[in-house]
Amino acid sequence: MADRRVLFVHAHPDDESIETGATIARYAAEGAHVTLVTCTLGEEGEIIPPELAHHAADRDDTLGRYRIGELAAACAALGVTDHRFLGGVGRWRDSGMMGAPSNLRPDCFWQADLDEAAAELVKVIREVRPQVLVTYDENGTYGHPDHIKAHRVSWRAYELAADPAFPGGEPWRIAKVYHTAQPRSVLRRGVEAMRGADMPFTRVASVDELPFGCDDAQVTTEIDARAHLPAKFAALRAHATQVMVHEPWFALSNGIGREVLGVEFFTLKAGTPGPRVAGVPAGEGGLGGPRLLETDLFAGIG
């Protein structure tokens, strides 16, 4: 068993690459055991290439199966060799955006029984025994029901996995739990850089137009994975039904450009913080400023 083991829990194929791709690639390259759990197949996603539009949920409804291949290619690019779908392939369906009729499907992830879904994640935790768990914040980053449910399932599994009274395998206490974070100052720099950039995507006028972002003060941890940007770009390109790439930018089906980050940010929500040091300067993609940050998800773990 590898000395360092980290579990990433994401809602759909492509989320792992967009939010944590560089971090995943860095730890995989360093020899850590990286486990990726994806909660749905992403069946309700909007499709970018016209020639693949027939896979859509309101047509052939085969997008989920197609995206399995995209995710496999992304995992290969990132160096992930341990990937699982929560509860098995297709156990829970993509719920679609908040308020969509697909939220009401009994087989969608949003409608999943919390303890039932968490029990499936407990199986993974007790098998892999990760020291670190990474998932989303309470709002699921931007309010998507599957992201919110992934957050809830992750935290319930974190509790149950450590409970000796919960059946199925030896208990395991995860040492540190992180939420992904997208600090507004970093997003603001990206918005400003796009104003004069040569790219085919839509530019937003202000960071306030983006449906995500957190106060800089919430960030506790900064992972410098700039050396692994090529892997992140390759993983993003693998998700061709969902992502368009024009380095150093990318866009989803809404066409709004965003910067691909090689420095990724997190908030420690459970566990003891490790040593904090000066991070990457703001001019090089980091948070910058006088605050000291963790620079390793495993910092402080004995």
Curated annotation (Swiss-Prot):
Pfam families: PIG-L (PF02585). Zn(2+) binds at residues 12, 15, 147. Binds 1 zinc ion per subunit. Its cofactor is Zn(2+). Disulfide bonds: none annotated. Keywords: Hydrolase, Metal-binding, Zinc. This is 1D-myo-inositol 2-acetamido-2-deoxy-alpha-D-glucopyranoside deacetylase. It comes from Thermobispora bispora (strain ATCC 19993 / DSM 43833 / CBS 139.67 / JCM 10125 / KCTC 9307 / NBRC 14880 / R51). The gene is mshB.
